[in-house]
Amino acid sequence: MTSKIFSPKISAVIESLRKLPTIGKKSSQRLALYLLDKSPETAIAIANSLLDATANIKKCVYCQALTEDDVCNICSNTNRDDTKLCIIESMLDMIAIEEAGIYRGKYFVLNGRISPLDGIGPSELKLDILQQIIADRKIDEVILAISPTVEGETTAHFISQMIAKDIKISRIGFGVPFGGELEYLDQQTLLHAFNARTNI
């Protein structure tokens, strides 16, 4: 239907926008038409910034967060607590925790969860890098801030099994409903979740 209404180039923009999370058919059409008709300069600015970012952004060699440098700002910050390592699923979780101001340690971003049905295993989550970081640093606590979904539980269990017994492993959970995503929690709930974390 859209091919009869829109030209091939407009349809291509709409289909590209539909690949973004939470963007459906109607939203992608609205965005495409706004950018092309009402604000072409915004479209060009977005395209240029994305081209520049994709050419220059990489993953931090330590925590796997997106950064322009080999080491991100948090990993290079000497004021952060090197003995605490918080394992999270995505940078959105990092943003939520940082904005809540509840944690001053370092992170490791999994960029996903173990999900055999989706072809995601330990190697896709760079758990070998995580294991090396834990071995190299004097870490006394690993905090698993992983969403309590089925895949999240599997991931948390796998990670807890690969960590040395002399390292404290804790899991946030208070106020985090099963199936809930960490990035959507309000700051007060996150604060309670961190303060009430339980040992594994």
Swiss-Prot record:
Disulfide links within the chain: none
Gene Ontology terms for molecular function: DNA binding; zinc ion binding
The UniProt record lists the keyword Disulfide bond: no
GO BP annotations, alphabetical order: DNA recombination; DNA repair
Domain Toprim: 83-177
HAMAP family: RecR
NCBIfam families listed in its UniProt record: recR
Name this protein carries in UniProt: Recombination protein RecR
Species of provenance: Francisella tularensis subsp. tularensis (strain WY96-3418)
Gene that encodes the chain: recR
